């Protein structure tokens, strides 16, 4: 360890923070914004993300996801790559594109943050499971709906040596109101 170290990078999967309730929203679903709690959660998430310093940020283009990553992106002058495949509609229509988006993160080798929605998480988690080093590790991934609560993140540490294999996975809840 002293000479080589453990060479990993994080891939962080975030469920957007608390949005205004669907029942109280009459405009387009992709325009539904964060609730007050969600805005506070997004600020807390931005502070927490500094522990991993993701330099690549991908997000669903839907407003609540973009608003979730905005405090972090703005603080560090990063850009958000909006991916339709990470939206609810995109993942429903083209789940293979969603899986490909996630798989590409393992090929890049850079710290990354992905923000998406609860209904997209099963596709995302299936794509993540392809990069586990052992089948036993799957028990450490969220397995039941809602998978992640609003604002939760799944932090994956990915090995540079094991073909993009995941060496650890942890769910972190940055804020509760």
What are these regions, as identified by a protein language model?
Residues 118-120:
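Short glycine-rich anion-binding loops that position phosphate/pyrophosphate groups of nucleotides
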Residues 1-2, 6-95, 99, 103, ...:
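Active-site-proximal alpha-helix that buttresses catalytic centers in soluble enzyme cores
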Residues 168-177:
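Short, solvent-exposed aromatic-acidic interface loops
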Residues 111, 156-159:
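Conserved beta strand-loop-helix elements of the APE1-like EEP
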Residues 11-12, 107-116:
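Generic beta-sheet signal
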């Amino acid at each position: 360890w002293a000479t080589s170290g453990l060479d990993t990078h994080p891939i962080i999967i975030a469920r957007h923070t608390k949005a205004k309730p669907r029942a109280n929203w009459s405009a387009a679903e992709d325009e539904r914004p964060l609730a007050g709690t969600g805005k506070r959660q997004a600020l807390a998430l931005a502070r927490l993300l500094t522990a991993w310093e993701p330099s690549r940020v991908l997000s669903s283009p839907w407003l609540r996801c973009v608003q979730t990553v905005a405090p972090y992106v703005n603080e560090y002058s990063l850009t958000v790559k909006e991916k339709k495949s990470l939206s609810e509609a995109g993942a429903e229509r083209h789940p293979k594109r969603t899986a490909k988006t996630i798989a590409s993160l393992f090929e890049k080798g850079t710290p990354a943050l992905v923000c998406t929605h609860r209904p997209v998480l099963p596709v995302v988690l299936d794509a993540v499971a392809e990069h586990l080093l052992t089948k036993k590790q799957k028990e450490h991934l969220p397995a039941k709906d809602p998978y992640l609560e609003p604002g939760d993140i799944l932090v994956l540490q990915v090995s540079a040596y094991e073909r993009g294999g995941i060496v650890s996975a942890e769910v972190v809840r940055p804020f509760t109101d």
